[in-house]
Amino acid sequence: MVNLKKIAKEEQGSALITVLIIALIVALFIGVVLGGIYVQSTFIQQDIDRTKALYQAEQQIYEFLYSGQEPDSTGTITSTNYGGFLKISSSTQVKKQKITLEVLTGVLPDSVFDYAIALKDTNSSLSVAGSTTINGDIASGSNQIERSTFKGFPFRGSFTGEAKKKNMRDFFPAFQYESLEVQLDKHSSFYESESKSKFAVRDLSELAQSQEGDTLYFADSQEWSINETTAIPKDIVVLVEGNLTITGDGNLGPYTTFFARDTLSIGGSIMATHAIVSAGIFMELRDQVSMNAQLISRGRIQLMDQVYLTYPSMVYSSTTTYLGEQQEVIHMQDESTVDGTLVYPIETGTFNQEQFRIKIDENALLRGSIYNQGQTELAGTVYGSVLTKQFFFYESPTTYINWIKDAEIDITQRPQDFIVPIGFSDSTKYVILDWKEVTE
Protein backbone atom coordinates (compact mmCIF):
# COMPACT_ATOMS: atom_id res chain seq x y z
CA MET A 1 0.00 0.00 0.00
CA VAL A 2 1.31 3.45 -0.83
CA ASN A 3 2.40 5.39 2.25
CA LEU A 4 1.56 9.02 1.49
CA LYS A 5 3.34 10.29 4.60
CA LYS A 6 6.57 8.47 3.58
CA ILE A 7 6.34 9.77 0.02
CA ALA A 8 5.68 13.26 1.28
CA LYS A 9 8.76 13.10 3.55
CA GLU A 10 11.04 11.69 0.83
CA GLU A 11 9.80 14.07 -1.81
CA GLN A 12 9.73 17.13 0.42
CA GLY A 13 10.64 20.13 -1.68
CA SER A 14 9.82 18.36 -4.95
CA ALA A 15 6.76 18.88 -7.17
CA LEU A 16 5.45 15.34 -6.64
CA ILE A 17 3.60 16.14 -3.44
CA THR A 18 1.91 19.07 -5.12
CA VAL A 19 0.81 16.86 -7.98
CA LEU A 20 -0.58 14.25 -5.59
CA ILE A 21 -2.55 16.85 -3.64
CA ILE A 22 -3.94 18.35 -6.81
CA ALA A 23 -4.85 14.89 -8.10
CA LEU A 24 -6.61 14.11 -4.83
CA ILE A 25 -8.55 17.37 -4.94
CA VAL A 26 -9.51 16.78 -8.56
CA ALA A 27 -10.62 13.22 -7.73
CA LEU A 28 -12.74 14.48 -4.84
CA PHE A 29 -14.22 17.20 -7.04
CA ILE A 30 -15.05 14.72 -9.78
CA GLY A 31 -16.63 12.42 -7.19
CA VAL A 32 -18.76 15.25 -5.83
CA VAL A 33 -19.81 16.28 -9.34
CA LEU A 34 -20.66 12.72 -10.34
CA GLY A 35 -22.52 12.21 -7.07
CA GLY A 36 -24.47 15.42 -7.66
CA ILE A 37 -25.30 14.36 -11.19
CA TYR A 38 -26.51 11.00 -9.90
CA VAL A 39 -28.66 12.59 -7.20
CA GLN A 40 -29.98 15.14 -9.66
CA SER A 41 -30.81 12.48 -12.23
CA THR A 42 -32.53 10.46 -9.50
CA PHE A 43 -34.72 13.42 -8.56
CA ILE A 44 -35.40 14.15 -12.22
CA GLN A 45 -36.44 10.54 -12.77
CA GLN A 46 -38.67 10.69 -9.68
CA ASP A 47 -40.29 13.85 -11.04
CA ILE A 48 -40.79 12.13 -14.39
CA ASP A 49 -42.34 9.08 -12.70
CA ARG A 50 -44.54 11.28 -10.54
CA THR A 51 -45.73 13.25 -13.57
CA LYS A 52 -46.54 10.00 -15.38
CA ALA A 53 -48.47 8.71 -12.36
CA LEU A 54 -50.37 12.00 -12.05
CA TYR A 55 -51.24 11.95 -15.74
CA GLN A 56 -52.47 8.35 -15.52
CA ALA A 57 -54.63 9.16 -12.47
CA GLU A 58 -56.14 12.13 -14.30
CA GLN A 59 -56.66 10.02 -17.42
CA GLN A 60 -58.51 7.37 -15.40
CA ILE A 61 -60.90 9.99 -14.04
CA TYR A 62 -61.53 11.40 -17.50
CA GLU A 63 -62.22 7.97 -18.99
CA PHE A 64 -64.48 7.00 -16.09
CA LEU A 65 -66.56 10.18 -16.37
CA TYR A 66 -66.75 10.68 -20.09
CA SER A 67 -66.24 7.30 -21.77
CA GLY A 68 -67.18 4.78 -19.09
CA GLN A 69 -63.96 2.83 -19.58
CA GLU A 70 -62.46 0.73 -16.82
CA PRO A 71 -58.85 1.54 -15.81
CA ASP A 72 -56.03 -0.68 -17.02
CA SER A 73 -53.95 -2.83 -14.69
CA THR A 74 -51.74 0.10 -13.68
CA GLY A 75 -54.39 1.79 -11.55
CA THR A 76 -57.63 1.62 -9.59
CA ILE A 77 -60.66 3.88 -9.54
CA THR A 78 -63.67 3.91 -7.21
CA SER A 79 -66.79 6.07 -6.97
CA THR A 80 -69.23 6.68 -4.13
CA ASN A 81 -72.29 8.87 -3.74
CA TYR A 82 -71.54 11.89 -1.59
CA GLY A 83 -74.89 13.49 -0.91
CA GLY A 84 -76.21 14.59 -4.29
CA PHE A 85 -72.79 14.49 -5.91
CA LEU A 86 -70.27 11.81 -6.85
CA LYS A 87 -66.88 11.37 -5.15
CA ILE A 88 -64.26 9.60 -7.27
CA SER A 89 -60.88 8.28 -6.12
CA SER A 90 -58.20 7.43 -8.70
CA SER A 91 -54.87 5.76 -7.78
CA THR A 92 -51.90 4.91 -9.99
CA GLN A 93 -48.25 4.00 -9.43
CA VAL A 94 -45.20 4.40 -11.66
CA LYS A 95 -42.16 2.67 -10.13
CA LYS A 96 -42.04 4.07 -6.57
CA GLN A 97 -44.25 7.10 -7.26
CA LYS A 98 -47.87 6.56 -6.17
CA ILE A 99 -50.56 9.18 -6.79
CA THR A 100 -54.14 9.26 -5.46
CA LEU A 101 -56.55 11.92 -6.69
CA GLU A 102 -60.03 12.61 -5.32
CA VAL A 103 -62.61 14.63 -7.23
CA LEU A 104 -66.15 15.74 -6.47
CA THR A 105 -68.49 15.95 -9.45
CA GLY A 106 -71.94 17.24 -10.26
CA VAL A 107 -73.73 17.40 -13.60
CA LEU A 108 -74.77 20.08 -16.04
CA PRO A 109 -78.54 20.65 -16.00
CA ASP A 110 -80.86 19.47 -18.78
CA SER A 111 -82.45 22.01 -21.10
CA VAL A 112 -85.59 22.26 -18.94
CA PHE A 113 -83.46 24.16 -16.41
CA ASP A 114 -82.92 26.87 -19.03
CA TYR A 115 -86.51 27.99 -18.49
CA ALA A 116 -87.25 30.57 -15.83
CA ILE A 117 -90.32 28.50 -14.90
CA ALA A 118 -91.46 24.97 -15.67
CA LEU A 119 -94.97 24.50 -14.26
CA LYS A 120 -96.08 20.87 -14.06
CA ASP A 121 -99.72 21.47 -13.05
CA THR A 122 -101.99 21.82 -16.08
CA ASN A 123 -105.27 22.42 -14.23
CA SER A 124 -104.85 26.19 -14.33
CA SER A 125 -102.68 28.69 -16.18
CA LEU A 126 -100.02 30.78 -14.49
CA SER A 127 -101.02 34.21 -13.18
CA VAL A 128 -98.60 36.98 -12.24
CA ALA A 129 -99.63 39.86 -10.02
CA GLY A 130 -98.25 42.85 -8.15
CA SER A 131 -94.61 43.67 -8.90
CA THR A 132 -93.66 40.18 -10.11
CA THR A 133 -90.73 40.23 -12.55
CA ILE A 134 -89.92 37.23 -14.75
CA ASN A 135 -86.97 37.29 -17.12
CA GLY A 136 -86.85 34.10 -19.19
CA ASP A 137 -89.13 31.65 -20.95
CA ILE A 138 -91.96 29.78 -19.23
CA ALA A 139 -92.87 26.16 -19.98
CA SER A 140 -96.37 25.04 -19.01
CA GLY A 141 -99.48 23.31 -20.33
CA SER A 142 -100.65 26.65 -21.68
CA ASN A 143 -99.08 29.19 -24.00
CA GLN A 144 -100.61 32.08 -22.10
CA ILE A 145 -99.62 33.93 -18.94
CA GLU A 146 -102.27 35.90 -17.12
CA ARG A 147 -101.22 39.39 -16.03
CA SER A 148 -103.75 39.70 -13.24
CA THR A 149 -105.24 42.50 -11.21
CA PHE A 150 -105.04 41.72 -7.51
CA LYS A 151 -107.63 43.27 -5.19
CA GLY A 152 -108.06 46.24 -7.48
CA PHE A 153 -104.34 46.81 -8.09
CA PRO A 154 -103.20 46.18 -11.69
CA PHE A 155 -100.12 44.16 -12.57
CA ARG A 156 -97.09 46.48 -12.46
CA GLY A 157 -94.26 44.01 -12.99
CA SER A 158 -92.79 42.61 -16.20
CA PHE A 159 -92.43 39.40 -18.17
CA THR A 160 -89.53 39.22 -20.62
CA GLY A 161 -89.64 35.94 -22.47
CA GLU A 162 -92.02 33.52 -24.15
CA ALA A 163 -94.75 31.30 -22.80
CA LYS A 164 -94.25 27.90 -24.44
CA LYS A 165 -96.83 25.13 -24.37
CA LYS A 166 -95.38 21.73 -23.50
CA ASN A 167 -96.61 18.26 -22.67
CA MET A 168 -95.60 18.69 -19.03
CA ARG A 169 -96.08 15.02 -18.19
CA ASP A 170 -93.06 14.30 -20.39
CA PHE A 171 -91.24 17.62 -20.22
CA PHE A 172 -91.11 17.96 -16.44
CA PRO A 173 -88.10 15.92 -15.31
CA ALA A 174 -88.10 13.10 -12.79
CA PHE A 175 -85.45 13.06 -10.08
CA GLN A 176 -83.89 9.74 -9.09
CA TYR A 177 -83.48 10.38 -5.39
CA GLU A 178 -82.95 6.78 -4.29
CA SER A 179 -79.22 7.23 -3.72
CA LEU A 180 -79.91 10.04 -1.25
CA GLU A 181 -82.42 7.90 0.60
CA VAL A 182 -79.94 5.01 0.73
CA GLN A 183 -77.43 7.33 2.40
CA LEU A 184 -80.06 8.42 4.92
CA ASP A 185 -80.97 4.78 5.56
CA LYS A 186 -77.32 3.92 6.15
CA HIS A 187 -76.99 6.58 8.84
CA SER A 188 -80.36 5.77 10.40
CA SER A 189 -79.57 2.05 10.63
CA PHE A 190 -76.34 2.82 12.45
CA TYR A 191 -78.31 3.76 15.57
CA GLU A 192 -79.83 0.28 15.67
CA SER A 193 -76.56 -1.58 15.10
CA GLU A 194 -74.87 -3.52 17.88
CA SER A 195 -71.44 -2.27 16.84
CA LYS A 196 -72.16 1.43 17.43
CA SER A 197 -70.50 1.31 20.87
CA LYS A 198 -67.15 0.69 19.14
CA PHE A 199 -67.32 4.24 17.76
CA ALA A 200 -68.53 5.93 20.95
CA VAL A 201 -66.94 9.17 22.16
CA ARG A 202 -68.06 11.40 25.00
CA ASP A 203 -67.42 15.02 24.12
CA LEU A 204 -65.99 17.53 21.67
CA SER A 205 -62.44 17.19 23.00
CA GLU A 206 -62.41 13.50 22.04
CA LEU A 207 -63.73 14.39 18.60
CA ALA A 208 -60.84 16.82 18.08
CA GLN A 209 -58.38 13.99 18.84
CA SER A 210 -59.85 11.68 16.21
CA GLN A 211 -58.17 10.81 12.92
CA GLU A 212 -59.05 11.64 9.35
CA GLY A 213 -61.85 9.39 8.10
CA ASP A 214 -63.04 8.24 11.55
CA THR A 215 -66.68 7.51 12.42
CA LEU A 216 -67.73 8.90 15.81
CA TYR A 217 -70.89 8.17 17.78
CA PHE A 218 -72.39 10.25 20.60
CA ALA A 219 -74.97 8.40 22.70
CA ASP A 220 -76.54 11.62 24.07
CA SER A 221 -77.64 14.98 22.69
CA GLN A 222 -74.78 17.42 22.19
CA GLU A 223 -74.28 21.20 22.50
CA TRP A 224 -70.96 22.42 21.11
CA SER A 225 -69.28 25.80 20.99
CA ILE A 226 -66.71 25.74 18.17
CA ASN A 227 -63.99 28.39 17.89
CA GLU A 228 -61.06 29.01 15.56
CA THR A 229 -58.76 26.79 17.62
CA THR A 230 -61.07 23.77 17.46
CA ALA A 231 -59.47 21.25 15.10
CA ILE A 232 -61.91 18.92 13.37
CA PRO A 233 -60.28 16.27 11.14
CA LYS A 234 -61.47 16.08 7.55
CA ASP A 235 -63.61 13.27 6.18
CA ILE A 236 -65.01 12.29 9.59
CA VAL A 237 -68.59 11.10 10.11
CA VAL A 238 -70.32 12.23 13.32
CA LEU A 239 -73.58 10.59 14.42
CA VAL A 240 -75.52 11.94 17.40
CA GLU A 241 -78.29 10.12 19.24
CA GLY A 242 -80.85 12.86 19.85
CA ASN A 243 -80.19 16.53 19.11
CA LEU A 244 -77.06 18.36 17.98
CA THR A 245 -76.52 22.10 18.50
CA ILE A 246 -73.39 23.82 17.16
CA THR A 247 -72.53 27.50 17.68
CA GLY A 248 -69.43 29.69 17.56
CA ASP A 249 -67.05 31.00 14.92
CA GLY A 250 -65.11 27.84 14.06
CA ASN A 251 -64.80 25.60 11.04
CA LEU A 252 -66.41 22.16 10.78
CA GLY A 253 -63.70 21.11 8.34
CA PRO A 254 -63.70 19.79 4.77
CA TYR A 255 -65.75 16.77 3.70
CA THR A 256 -67.24 16.19 7.14
CA THR A 257 -70.65 14.63 7.79
CA PHE A 258 -72.85 15.50 10.78
CA PHE A 259 -76.01 13.47 11.33
CA ALA A 260 -78.45 14.06 14.20
CA ARG A 261 -81.11 11.44 14.75
CA ASP A 262 -83.67 14.05 15.83
CA THR A 263 -82.88 17.76 15.35
CA LEU A 264 -79.82 19.71 14.26
CA SER A 265 -79.20 23.42 14.82
CA ILE A 266 -76.19 25.44 13.64
CA GLY A 267 -75.68 29.10 14.59
CA GLY A 268 -73.08 31.80 15.07
CA SER A 269 -70.65 32.19 12.17
CA ILE A 270 -69.78 28.53 11.67
CA MET A 271 -68.07 27.59 8.38
CA ALA A 272 -67.50 24.34 6.46
CA THR A 273 -66.39 23.12 3.03
CA HIS A 274 -68.19 20.36 1.12
CA ALA A 275 -69.90 19.22 4.31
CA ILE A 276 -72.99 17.04 4.62
CA VAL A 277 -75.40 18.10 7.36
CA SER A 278 -78.34 15.83 8.07
CA ALA A 279 -81.19 15.43 10.54
CA GLY A 280 -84.02 12.99 11.02
CA ILE A 281 -86.78 15.38 12.12
CA PHE A 282 -85.83 19.06 11.86
CA MET A 283 -82.86 21.18 10.81
CA GLU A 284 -82.20 24.87 11.39
CA LEU A 285 -79.35 27.15 10.31
CA ARG A 286 -79.33 30.69 11.68
CA ASP A 287 -77.26 33.82 12.41
CA GLN A 288 -74.26 34.32 10.08
CA VAL A 289 -73.51 30.69 9.27
CA SER A 290 -71.60 30.54 5.97
CA MET A 291 -70.77 27.15 4.54
CA ASN A 292 -70.55 25.07 1.43
CA ALA A 293 -72.83 22.20 2.35
CA GLN A 294 -75.47 19.69 1.42
CA LEU A 295 -78.42 19.79 3.80
CA ILE A 296 -80.20 16.43 3.64
CA SER A 297 -83.19 15.54 5.80
CA ARG A 298 -86.37 13.53 6.11
CA GLY A 299 -87.73 16.46 8.08
CA ARG A 300 -88.22 20.19 7.75
CA ILE A 301 -85.29 22.50 6.91
CA GLN A 302 -85.27 26.15 7.92
CA LEU A 303 -82.71 28.84 6.98
CA MET A 304 -82.85 32.11 8.93
CA ASP A 305 -81.15 35.48 9.44
CA GLN A 306 -78.08 35.97 7.20
CA VAL A 307 -77.28 32.31 6.59
CA TYR A 308 -75.31 31.84 3.36
CA LEU A 309 -74.90 28.46 1.69
CA THR A 310 -72.17 28.95 -0.90
CA TYR A 311 -71.95 27.33 -4.33
CA PRO A 312 -72.52 24.49 -5.03
CA SER A 313 -74.78 23.74 -2.07
CA MET A 314 -77.92 21.61 -2.01
CA VAL A 315 -80.95 21.59 0.29
CA TYR A 316 -82.95 18.36 0.14
CA SER A 317 -85.97 17.17 2.09
CA SER A 318 -88.10 14.08 1.56
CA THR A 319 -90.49 14.45 4.46
CA THR A 320 -94.05 13.24 4.07
CA THR A 321 -95.29 14.27 7.52
CA TYR A 322 -96.24 17.67 8.86
CA LEU A 323 -94.27 19.30 11.66
CA GLY A 324 -97.11 20.82 13.62
CA GLU A 325 -99.34 22.67 11.16
CA GLN A 326 -96.50 23.85 8.94
CA GLN A 327 -96.47 22.60 5.38
CA GLU A 328 -93.11 24.17 4.47
CA VAL A 329 -90.52 21.44 4.02
CA ILE A 330 -87.81 23.95 3.02
CA HIS A 331 -88.17 27.53 4.23
CA MET A 332 -85.75 30.35 3.39
CA GLN A 333 -86.47 33.19 5.79
CA ASP A 334 -85.14 36.70 6.46
CA GLU A 335 -82.04 37.47 4.35
CA SER A 336 -80.86 33.90 3.88
CA THR A 337 -79.06 33.06 0.63
CA VAL A 338 -78.44 29.77 -1.15
CA ASP A 339 -76.16 29.32 -4.14
CA GLY A 340 -77.27 25.93 -5.39
CA THR A 341 -80.38 23.76 -5.64
CA LEU A 342 -83.45 23.26 -3.45
CA VAL A 343 -85.00 19.82 -3.93
CA TYR A 344 -88.30 18.33 -2.76
CA PRO A 345 -88.89 15.22 -4.93
CA ILE A 346 -92.01 13.69 -3.33
CA GLU A 347 -95.40 14.08 -4.97
CA THR A 348 -97.94 13.58 -2.19
CA GLY A 349 -101.47 14.98 -2.01
CA THR A 350 -103.84 15.27 -4.95
CA PHE A 351 -105.68 18.26 -3.50
CA ASN A 352 -104.24 21.76 -3.30
CA GLN A 353 -104.38 21.97 0.49
CA GLU A 354 -102.42 18.72 0.92
CA GLN A 355 -99.25 19.84 -0.87
CA PHE A 356 -95.93 20.29 0.89
CA ARG A 357 -94.15 23.54 0.09
CA ILE A 358 -90.84 25.19 -0.56
CA LYS A 359 -91.15 28.76 0.68
CA ILE A 360 -88.84 31.70 -0.06
CA ASP A 361 -89.57 34.85 1.92
CA GLU A 362 -89.42 38.41 0.63
CA ASN A 363 -85.75 39.21 1.31
CA ALA A 364 -84.33 35.74 0.72
CA LEU A 365 -82.27 34.94 -2.39
CA LEU A 366 -81.66 31.72 -4.31
CA ARG A 367 -79.02 31.65 -7.04
CA GLY A 368 -79.60 28.35 -8.77
CA SER A 369 -82.75 26.27 -9.10
CA ILE A 370 -85.79 24.92 -7.32
CA TYR A 371 -87.00 21.41 -8.12
CA ASN A 372 -90.29 20.82 -6.34
CA GLN A 373 -92.92 18.11 -6.74
CA GLY A 374 -95.09 20.07 -4.32
CA GLN A 375 -95.99 23.76 -4.10
CA THR A 376 -93.67 26.75 -4.29
CA GLU A 377 -94.54 29.85 -2.28
CA LEU A 378 -92.33 32.58 -3.66
CA ALA A 379 -92.08 36.13 -2.35
CA GLY A 380 -88.32 36.55 -2.69
CA THR A 381 -85.83 36.33 -5.54
CA VAL A 382 -84.62 33.43 -7.67
CA TYR A 383 -81.70 34.03 -9.99
CA GLY A 384 -82.21 30.85 -11.94
CA SER A 385 -85.09 28.48 -12.62
CA VAL A 386 -88.16 27.24 -10.75
CA LEU A 387 -89.38 23.76 -11.67
CA THR A 388 -92.50 23.15 -9.60
CA LYS A 389 -95.75 21.25 -9.59
CA GLN A 390 -97.71 24.31 -8.41
CA PHE A 391 -97.29 27.85 -7.20
CA PHE A 392 -99.11 28.94 -4.06
CA PHE A 393 -99.77 31.93 -1.89
CA TYR A 394 -102.40 32.83 0.63
CA GLU A 395 -103.89 36.19 1.50
CA SER A 396 -106.89 36.05 3.78
CA PRO A 397 -109.40 34.77 3.08
CA THR A 398 -108.28 33.32 -0.26
CA THR A 399 -105.80 30.68 -1.40
CA TYR A 400 -104.26 31.39 -4.80
CA ILE A 401 -103.02 28.41 -6.82
CA ASN A 402 -100.53 29.03 -9.64
CA TRP A 403 -100.27 32.71 -8.82
CA ILE A 404 -97.00 34.55 -8.27
CA LYS A 405 -97.16 37.90 -6.49
CA ASP A 406 -94.35 40.40 -5.83
CA ALA A 407 -91.52 37.99 -6.64
CA GLU A 408 -88.58 37.94 -9.06
CA ILE A 409 -87.29 35.10 -11.25
CA ASP A 410 -84.39 35.87 -13.60
CA ILE A 411 -82.76 32.99 -15.46
CA THR A 412 -80.10 35.29 -16.95
CA GLN A 413 -78.59 35.98 -13.51
CA ARG A 414 -77.89 32.33 -12.74
CA PRO A 415 -74.17 31.42 -12.46
CA GLN A 416 -72.84 30.51 -15.91
CA ASP A 417 -71.36 27.13 -14.95
CA PHE A 418 -74.28 26.15 -12.73
CA ILE A 419 -74.55 22.44 -11.89
CA VAL A 420 -77.28 20.29 -10.36
CA PRO A 421 -77.20 17.14 -8.22
CA ILE A 422 -76.86 13.79 -9.98
CA GLY A 423 -80.21 12.14 -10.68
CA PHE A 424 -82.06 14.35 -13.16
CA SER A 425 -80.88 12.61 -16.31
CA ASP A 426 -79.53 9.26 -17.49
CA SER A 427 -77.22 10.97 -20.00
CA THR A 428 -75.09 12.95 -17.59
CA LYS A 429 -72.54 15.61 -18.46
CA TYR A 430 -70.23 15.66 -15.48
CA VAL A 431 -68.56 18.75 -14.06
CA ILE A 432 -65.68 18.56 -11.59
CA LEU A 433 -66.39 20.70 -8.52
CA ASP A 434 -63.32 19.96 -6.42
CA TRP A 435 -59.98 18.31 -7.15
CA LYS A 436 -57.36 17.31 -4.62
CA GLU A 437 -54.34 15.07 -4.26
CA VAL A 438 -54.53 12.76 -1.27
CA THR A 439 -51.39 12.56 0.86
CA GLU A 440 -50.75 9.06 2.18
Segments (PLM) and residue ranges:
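Short, ordered "entry" segments at domain starts
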Residues: 82-86, 91-232, 237, 247-252, ...
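Beta-strand/loop motifs with alternating small/hydrophobic and polar/acidic residues, enriched
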Residues: 2-121, 126-128, 142, 427-440
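Intrinsically disordered, low-complexity terminal regions
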Residues: 14, 20, 26-36, 40, ...
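Residue-level marker of beta-strand positions
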Residues: 15, 27-28, 137, 294, ...
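Hydrophilic extracytoplasmic domains
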Residues: 273-274, 278-282, 287-440
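Short, charged, low-hydrophobicity "junction" segments
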Residues: 35, 113-115, 188-193, 314-323
